[in-house]
Amino acid sequence: QWQAFEAGSRAVGSFPSNKLQDGSRIAVIGAGPAGSMFSYFSLKMAQAVGLDLNVDIFEPRKFCHRGPAGCNHCGGVVSESLVQRLATEGIMIPDGVVQRGVESYTLHMDVGDVEIATPLLEKRIAAIYRGNGPRHSELSDTQSFDGFLLQLAEERGANLIPRLVTDVRRDEEKMHVICADSHRDTYDLVVLASGANSRLMEILENQSQEFQSPGRTTTFICEFKLGREVINETFGPSMHVFLLDIPRLEFAALIPKGDYVSLCLLGDDIDDELMQLFFSSPEVANCFPGGFIPEHVCHCYPRINIKAARPTYSDRLVMIGDSGATRLFKDGIGAAYRTAKAAAKTAIFHGVSAADFKQHYAPLCHGIDKDNQVGKVVFGFGSLVQKARFARRGRRRRAPRRSGTRGRTHGPPCRSPRSTRRRRARRSR
């Protein structure tokens, strides 16, 4: 049976062999960014200290498949700072994975639109290809971000096991991983990186009174296929963010990527009523060609982590990424990187007992939790701005506008600065 996470039938860190040794086995459940990065870092660190480990990654999905089998339920936006951090780790993201460099944010409100350039016009964020999610998308040779990270882990020596894990149990000093096809195996450390949409977290919560799975809320993500030329003309190199007075809506954005535009709605349990209010807003329709919102080619209602698991570790068990602690409504990939590296460092250099994770891994999770408390205040202030028209006008006036753009209320579809310059050139002639 599932036993105490931090205290109970065993004292914290009471396992006598809490250090990984040559031949130790690690099971990583989930090959998303968190799971693949943990595998990469743990094998890299183990090699540095001369430790021979066996790392198995359990992942039934294939990221090149169309439809749900290849979908990662994510908007796929990373900051330039994260790209640079990964580069210092030897992880150079291929150009094909980055679908578009985002040069600005376009803020849409009922009082007008404002385009806000990034500092020094640097490309501070990037829209990446997470997987072949759209059901009617064409087969693509483009490598996904998740597939790229998984390949790096495999090149380091990780083994990919295409099985769905349905249970994790402890027996004496070992952990047992049980799969849907009744396959089971024994490991010295289990790393949960299955994400917020996995039922495995609920199963573990039912087995232990000490464990609380991450707090979650329902979101909405969909894809519009418009083609590169139309996207370049109407959306440009900008991420379009909406500040609308819609109850329970905390964040909404249209993100251009290749031939598709991704829509992400985040808030308090997104439902049909909220979505209808959003899609009926003229500010949204005006972003599309002709002021008409086309049918989306796929959609999903993924759950996201809004509160860390309690606790995020136990003897020979650690939870990372969305399974453990992540940033509120943003930078989930960045949090996956931070938690994966911290957990790997703890396991390789310190040990795999609850005491080791409490001392060397838990402080990072607590720090993320504190950041999220501040984030809730910021989002609360944003909700007040959404409700107060005078505040939205003030926000529009104070925004550092980019040259060649102007605020617009219910005007024609939003266009890129390039198309704006072409129209002005035609007028001058």
Task: Locate each region found by the language model.
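Extreme N-terminal leader/targeting segments of oxidoreductases
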Residues: 1-26, 41-54
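Predominantly flavin-linked oxidoreductase catalytic cores and closely associated redox partners
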Residues: 41, 151-286
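Glycine-rich FAD pyrophosphate-binding loop
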Residues: 43-71
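Short beta-strand to alpha-helix junction loop
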Residues: 74-77, 122-151, 199, 222, ...
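FAD/FMN-dependent oxidoreductases across multiple families
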Residues: 98, 184, 269-347
